[in-house]
Amino acid sequence: MAREKFERNKPHVNIGTIGHVDHGKTTLTAAITNVLAKKGQAEVQNYADIDGAPEERERGITINTAHVEYETETRHYAHVDCPGHADYVKNMITGAAQMDGAILVCAATDGPMAQTKEHILLAKQVGVPALVVALNKCDMVDDEEIIELVEMEIRELLSSYDFPGDDIPVVQVSGLKAIEGEAEWEAKIEELMAAVDSSIPEPEREVDKPFLMAVEDVFSITGRGTVATGRIERGIVKVGEEIEIVGIKDTRKTTVTGVEMFRKLLDEGMAGDNVGLLLRGIQKEDIERGMVLVKPGSITPHTKFEGQVYVLKKEEGGRHTPFFAGYRPQFYIRTTDVTGQITAFTAEDGSNVEMVMPGDNIQMTGELICPVAIEQGMRFAIREGGRTIGAGVVSKIIE
């Protein structure tokens, strides 16, 4: 019986709950599954199931994340919830759990707190496109005016981080009362999910985006030419199409004369495929790991960018000691290490930071020694002698 309802005939959207510790993110997640389960659109997950999330490792970083899934009338959702603040930081920066949108949970009893702000900033930096606010614990506040003040405060806060604070839906909920089955609060969860359905845009499918493949390896095939292999990150490439080779050296154009997968010839390769592309008029020495093959004009190489970085703790295999501006690590971007320099560290309020400790979450400005294809929202690792010491996401391209 329960098996039938998860047919994949609805658009799939990835979301998560974010917000300050103890504001009720996990309880709200449980409440959503409880309310939707009554309509046969979810399996009930209780607080303990979600809170006891197993550890996962993403690029060597340990993250606790709970994954639940449910449906509304129009969509299928995968929802992530993390037990601890550090897990959110790591999750959002590494992109371990991609979010097309998020439910910002804020307790009406407390209003916005330190991590409320930090999570909004993180959402902005890592490119979470849309938020919906769940004003939680509203059953505990008798005075409607207090709730209105908290709502105003949240809207101003969102606007200060360049989210559309005036337009974002704010829904008054009580996760606990909804789980206990009180009808008015169950209705509020449905209202929240209706807001999520309408305010969080459906993500563009990878296959509809402009073609990009990072080069992993290059071969010469006698009598046929040069083949670049890799996994197509997005888009579609067809035999006979013109593409650009971008990064490290000057950008140049070529034509794809063959697409091969598992030794078979194809007419086209699409997002997710591991392929070899035969390139016209290209010598083996013209192309190397770390370059990308792209739809012409869709991406340009850059050397200078801002990033949001999580610095690994020593228990995670990171550094044991702090480092300072001027530090020269390797930036691992897509398929290769590029030497660069971290020229500045910036705190949340925009002030300069001298020293960065293992375990910190920080904004940095980086400069690479050669131009590579980087873009906003792209993930990278910071490495030193082959081991990862930081994980980051590009928040802004400078030049």
Curated annotation (Swiss-Prot):
Region (G2): 60-64
Spans annotated as G4: 136-139
InterPro entries hit by this protein: EF-Tu_GTP-bd, EF-Tu_GTPase, EFTu-like_2, EFTU_2, G_TR_CS, P-loop_NTPase, Small_GTP-bd, T_Tr_GTP-bd_dom
Pfam families for this protein: GTP_EFTU, GTP_EFTU_D2, GTP_EFTU_D3
EC number: 3.6.5.3
Region (G1): 19-26
GO annotation, cellular component aspect: cytosol
Ligand binding (Mg(2+)): T26
Keywords: Cytoplasm, Elongation factor, GTP-binding, Hydrolase, Magnesium, Metal-binding, Nucleotide-binding, Protein biosynthesis
G3: annotated span: 81-84
Protein role: GTP hydrolase that promotes the GTP-dependent binding of aminoacyl-tRNA to the A-site of ribosomes during protein biosynthesis.
Subunit and partners: Monomer.
NCBIfam families in alphabetical order: EF-Tu, PRK00049.1, PRK12735.1, PRK12736.1, small_GTP
Protein name: Elongation factor Tu
Taxonomic path: Bacteria, Bacillati, Cyanobacteriota, Cyanophyceae, Synechococcales
